[in-house]
Every structure is written in C-alpha cells, then in structure tokens.
Amino acid sequence: MASLCLSSSRIVSLHHQKPFLALKLRPRPSNISGLGHSTSVVCFNPLRLSADRQRTATVSARAEKRRKRGSSVVCYATPMLSVHNLQWISTISCVALMFARGTGIHKSFVVPLFALQAPMGIVSWMKGEYGIWAAFLALLTRLFFSFPVELELPFIALLLVIVAPYQVMSIRGKQEGAILSLAISCFLAFQHFSRAGTLQKAFDQNSVLATVAIIGVTVVSFLFLI
C-alpha cells in the first residue's frame, strides 16, 4: 500500500505539472499575436500617408502644369505688342515715308515724329561718336558735292537728334510725347487721304507704300497713348 501511495503521488504530481506548464505557456502565443497585430497596424499607417502624399503631389503637379501653360500663352502673346517692337514699326514707317513717292504730305513733319518714336538704341547711336562722324561726313559731302534729294530728310533727322536738348528728348516715352506723335500722325493721315481723293486711289500701286506707312505710324501712336 505504501508503494501505491508513492506511485499515485507521482502520477498526481505529474498530472498536475502538465496542466501547469500548459497554462504557463498559453499566454505567449497571445502576446505574439497581439504584437503582430499592433505591428501590422503601425505598418499600415505609413503606407496610407505615403499614398496621400503621392495623391497631393500629383494634384499639385497638374496645377503647376496648368499654371505654366497659361503663363506661356501670356509670354508668347505679349512680345508682339511690346514697346520696343512698336518703336521699330514706327521707325520703319517713318523711313518709308521719307523715301516714298505718290503722296502729298509735308514730309518735314516726319522728322520730329522719327525723333520722338525711334528706339533708344538708334538715338544713342546717333548721339554717340559714330553718329557725330556720320553727320560730319554728310555735311562735308553736302557742302562740296551734289547731295541726293532723297537723303535730305534722313540727314536732317540725324542732325535734329544730335542737337536736340535734353528737355526735348526727355518727353520720349511720356504722355506728352505720345500726344504730340498722335497729333502729327493724324495730320499726315488727313493730308494723305484728302489729297488722294478716294480710298481706292490711296491703295494704288504708286501710293500703297505711303498709305501703309501712314497707317502704321498712326496706329502705333494711338497704342503709345493708350
């Protein structure tokens, strides 16, 4: 009976030891699973943030492209009517009027118009050393040789720009200069079209160059005033 008691105690102890070990080992998988769940939650948030950032970057990139397209259209359209281009159009028109035939205008009015609307580069060249030498040589040629009639007005325009005082040249690019230029242009246009008789005669083969030049000068003077 004593042996039975000892064996039963061992069996009981072993029987109680297994559940104790089993109960002690059970919480570990739960901790691991809980850790895995929390880790999965932490890993999911950065992916969501990165997706939101990519979406925001895509929207901002599209808005930037639209803004660049609009600004490129503006930059393409504005240089066509810049002040520099308008000055060159007026200068070419004035030179064409100086040499044009088939018009009844007083061409002497073209000289101050040229001085008021010529680009600053041309005015600086005329007032510089090269312009003074050109005027000096032209004056010597005019004194000792026969001077072509077509070159009289360009020579006078060169001398006018050289000897013009600062107070007179300072109205270039201002409202006073624009008003004076528009008045001269309208007077020349009135003379040209009134002496041409009809609009059809103004666009004849002999007068078409002067007509286009006068229209160009008048339109440019009006745009300068605006």
From Swiss-Prot:
Chloroplast intermembrane topological domain residue ranges: 101-103, 151-152, 198-205
Residues annotated as transit peptide in the record: 1-76
Stromal side: 77-79, 125-129, 174-176
Membrane topology: Multi-pass membrane protein
Location in or out of the cell: Plastid, Chloroplast inner membrane
Record has Repressor as a keyword: no
Transmembrane domains' residue ranges: 80-100, 104-124, 130-150, 153-173, 177-197, 206-226
Biological process terms in GO annotation: cellular response to cold; cold acclimation
Pfam family, one: WCOR413
Signals that turn on the gene: Accumulates at low levels in response to cold treatment.
Subcellular location, principal: plastid
Signal peptide range: none
Protein's recorded name: Cold-regulated 413 inner membrane protein 2, chloroplastic
Record organism: Arabidopsis thaliana (Mouse-ear cress)
